[in-house]
């Protein structure tokens, strides 16, 4: 049900905020713009700057309102008037980050706005002291037991207010944050859900709730308000849960209803494509976003990750210099510079910049993960483990941190730990072949060969990014003396390489041709064996074996040895490789395609 214009400010500024009536759909974009402008002001008054910026950016993407439709500021209550002087002074102190001073002058204030700023100042004071302690004991890697000492007191006071039903939407949001910081996750989720019902326009509450949801099943059981804000929340959580197809559909719907100029939505779409490793699409969107919003810093660390993967040194260098000119002390800027140095193999400098990012914001997920990668490059496994663990503390859905831990314990030759972490990464990214190949290698080391085979085949079935799954599966069949299955895997590997037009010159291609040459030779299929042996001659490591096999085939033919008719060939070479243009047949799936470990 759409809300009338007059209802919105009254609902928000009521003494004890009731459920806020806002639009349930996007049928009235003018009304939505009014609501966004209103909440941008209310969050700014309370020092919730990120929520204010998000609302303002979204409002800016909608058509401007005529003067007659612009809303006046919300009416001032009697309590607001009594606390006005204290609030004005305290807000000035708050804005320059003198949180204790702000809290001191707000003590005893009764208005909702002043009370929130009082409690929020105390919370941020505790966070600042904790972060200072963290930096002093450095590195961010020795964060250890440093806690925000204000949390327990804040919880007690906010709990009393909550039980008395005296918290408005902002108060509920802060109570939820305190509960989350105390690791009271279930209670925090309940409070954040309540906050979204009381004040659906506050993006910060939705975002905090998003950070606590671990899977789609958990999402289904949440009782969320039926408002247009829910669509933004669902698009965001789908992206976080790696449900990229659903996320992209949601964002496309938001563009279609009128938010096509939103830089937030465009950036989220780019992040979604980054998450599914559609690098070209993601790069294209980020480049377009940079043209529209050249001074934007948000998500530029993700953009730099894409440039890093593509080894685009000059573009990454330009991005790093550009962001330095805009704001060298932003966490995203530090991460971009870190990526630049990492691409140049200057890993100590890269780690230093990731540490700088963490001094600015110890809860910045990307910096922890990237620093873990750098410590891995420097062979400092203990520091890498700590960095990845901190990343998981910040966000348990970060598959890169779980995967990094798996790699670290693999280096330490601790396969059971390795298996646990790779499993967690696979749960978060079930269709990522890298996780499946890593799992397969782990099972192989633990001599659980059946499970290893399942993983390798599944990795191939979901789309093998690194084109190694079939080779590893073939070698496993070799180890088990399952020659026919090994040959099937190698021929499919060769077919895949040549069908997609890749020019691959590495050890595994030569390994495949060598095995196939020997396999066909044993089967007395001279034409196929000869073709594969000739291919072996193109590689340094198999050239001599290829020549020797060709000599043997020639000798046997000269002796009148005829090809066998008794041993059936399970498949044939691609027509482009076969001397006699034998047609190809699709490889049997080994009955493993539907099985996951």
From Swiss-Prot:
Residues found modified as Phosphothreonine: 562, 565, 582, 596
Record-listed Phosphotyrosine modification sites: 273
Keywords: Acetylation, Cell cycle, Cell division, Isopeptide bond, Mitosis, Phosphoprotein, Repeat, TPR repeat, Ubl conjugation, Ubl conjugation pathway
Keyword Cytoplasm found: no
Sequence similarity: Belongs to the APC8/CDC23 family.
Subunit structure: The mammalian APC/C is composed at least of 14 distinct subunits ANAPC1, ANAPC2, CDC27/APC3, ANAPC4, ANAPC5, CDC16/APC6, ANAPC7, CDC23/APC8, ANAPC10, ANAPC11, CDC26/APC12, ANAPC13, ANAPC15 and ANAPC16 that assemble into a complex of at least 19 chains with a combined molecular mass of around 1.2 MDa; APC/C interacts with FZR1 and FBXO5. Interacts with FBXO43; the interaction is direct.
Protein name (database record): Cell division cycle protein 23 homolog
Protein's organism: Homo sapiens (Human)
Organism lineage string: Eukaryota, Metazoa, Chordata, Craniata, Vertebrata
């Amino acid at each position: 049900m759409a809300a009338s214009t007059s209802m919105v400010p009254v609902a928000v500024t009521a003494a004890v905020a009731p459920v806020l009536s806002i639009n349930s759909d996007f049928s009235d974009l003018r009304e939505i713009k009014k609501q966004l402008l209103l909440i941008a002001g209310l969050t700014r008054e309370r020092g919730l700057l990120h929520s204010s910026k998000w609302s303002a950016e979204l409002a800016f993407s909608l058509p401007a309102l005529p003067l007659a439709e612009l809303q006046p500021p919300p009416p001032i209550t009697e309590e607001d008037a009594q606390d006005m002087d204290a609030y004005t002074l305290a807000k000035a102190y708050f804005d320059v980050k003198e949180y204790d001073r702000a809290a001191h002058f707000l003590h005893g204030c009764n208005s909702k706005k002043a009370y929130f700023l009082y409690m929020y100042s105390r919370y941020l004071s505790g966070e600042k002291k904790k972060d200072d302690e963290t930096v002093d004991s450095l590195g961010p890697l020795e964060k250890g037991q440093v806690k925000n000492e204000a949390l327990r007191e804040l919880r007690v006071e906010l709990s009393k207010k909550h039980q008395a039903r005296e918290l408005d939407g902002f108060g509920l949001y802060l109570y939820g944050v305190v509960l989350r910081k105390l690791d009271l996750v279930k209670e925090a989720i309940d409070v954040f859900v309540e906050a979204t019902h009381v004040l659906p326009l506050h993006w910060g509450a939705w975002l905090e709730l998003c950070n606590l949801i671990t899977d789609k099943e958990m999402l289904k059981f949440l009782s969320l308000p039926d408002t247009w804000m829910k669509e933004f929340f669902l698009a965001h959580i789908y992206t976080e849960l790696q449900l990229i197809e659903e996320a992209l559909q949601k964002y496309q719907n938001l563009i279609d209803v009128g938010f096509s100029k939103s830089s937030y939505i465009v950036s989220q779409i780019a992040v979604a494509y980054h998450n599914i490793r559609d690098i070209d699409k993601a790069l294209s969107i980020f480049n377009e976003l940079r043209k529209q919003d050249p001074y934007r810093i948000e998500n530029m660390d993700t953009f730099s990750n894409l440039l890093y993967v593509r080894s685009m040194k000059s573009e990454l260098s330009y991005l790093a210099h550009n962001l330095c000119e805009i704001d060298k002390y932003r966490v995203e800027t530090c991460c971009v510079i870190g990526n630049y140095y990492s691409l140049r193999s200057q890993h100590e400098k890269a780690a230093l910049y990731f540490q700088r990012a963490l001094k600015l914001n110890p809860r910045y997920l990307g910096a922890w993960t990237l620093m873990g990668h750098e410590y891995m490059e420097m062979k400092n496994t203990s520091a890498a483990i700590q960095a990845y663990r901190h990343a998981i503390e910040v966000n348990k859905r970060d598959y890169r941190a779980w995967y990094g831990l798996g790699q670290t314990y693999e280096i330490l030759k601790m396969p059971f730990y390795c298996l646990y972490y790779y499993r967690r990464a696979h749960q978060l990214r079930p269709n990522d072949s890298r996780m499946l190949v890593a799992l397969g290698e782990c099972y192989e080391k633990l001599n659980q060969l059946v499970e290893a085979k399942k993983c390798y085949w599944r990795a191939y079935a979901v789309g093998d990014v690194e084109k190694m799954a079939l080779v590893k599966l073939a070698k496993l069949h070799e180890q088990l003396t399952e020659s026919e299955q090994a040959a099937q895997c190698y021929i499919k590997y060769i077919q895949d390489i040549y069908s997609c037009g890749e020019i691959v010159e590495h050890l595994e291609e030569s390994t495949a041709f060598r095995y196939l040459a020997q396999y066909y030779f044993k089967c007395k299929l001279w034409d196929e064996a000869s073709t594969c042996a000739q291919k072996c001659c193109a590689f340094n490591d198999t050239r001599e074996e290829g020549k020797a096999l060709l000599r043997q085939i020639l000798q046997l033919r000269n002796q009148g040895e005829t090809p066998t008719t008794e041993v059936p060939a399970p498949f044939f070479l691609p027509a482009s490789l076969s001397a006699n243009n034998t047609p190809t047949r699709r490889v049997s799936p080994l009955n493993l395609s539907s099985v996951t470990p």
